[in-house]
Amino acid sequence: MANSSSGLAVSDECKVKFRDLKARRSFRFIVFRIDDKDMEIKVDRLGEPNQGYGDFTDSLPADECRYAIYDLDFTTVENCQKSKIFFFSWSPDTARTRSKMLYASSKDRFRRELDGIQCEIQATDPSEMSLDIVKSRTN
């Protein structure tokens, strides 16, 4: 289904891979990109379950926008093991203005397609999505 504000569709693969991450924990992270030619949101990269947060942040391009999902494992102050699914909107300052506008106008609709997201982070610089910042959002 196309996004009414941006005209973008969401590929079925996006939904399938997200369900695999959520239900089976098949992936640690998923990076999504907007394909300008097809006007569709597609899977760009998949992170294996053994990959860490550094692998995830390294997979985001320095000068292009992306959406991403990260499945964060953490320990609560009560010493309980938990996980939360984070949605990232990555829009670096060096990205093209048109790209930033397209990602911004499609974000809410795309996020609604992915049922089960627990936290959201918007970042324009790597410092805005440091692991400490992400962990602070688990409370």
Swiss-Prot record:
GO biological process: actin filament depolymerization
A Gene Ontology term for the protein's cellular component: actin cytoskeleton
UniProt-listed InterPro entries: ADF-H, ADF-H/Gelsolin-like_dom_sf, ADF/Cofilin
Superkingdom of this protein's organism: Eukaryota
Chain ranges of the ADF-H domain: 7-139
Gene3D superfamilies in alphabetical order: Severin (3.40.20.10)
One annotated GO molecular function: actin filament binding
Entries under Pfam families matching the protein: Cofilin_ADF
Transmembrane region(s): none
Keyword terms: Actin-binding
Primary role: Actin-depolymerizing protein. Severs actin filaments (F-actin) and binds to actin monomers.
Family statement: Belongs to the actin-binding proteins ADF family.
Name this polypeptide is given: Actin-depolymerizing factor 2
Organism per entry: Zea mays (Maize)
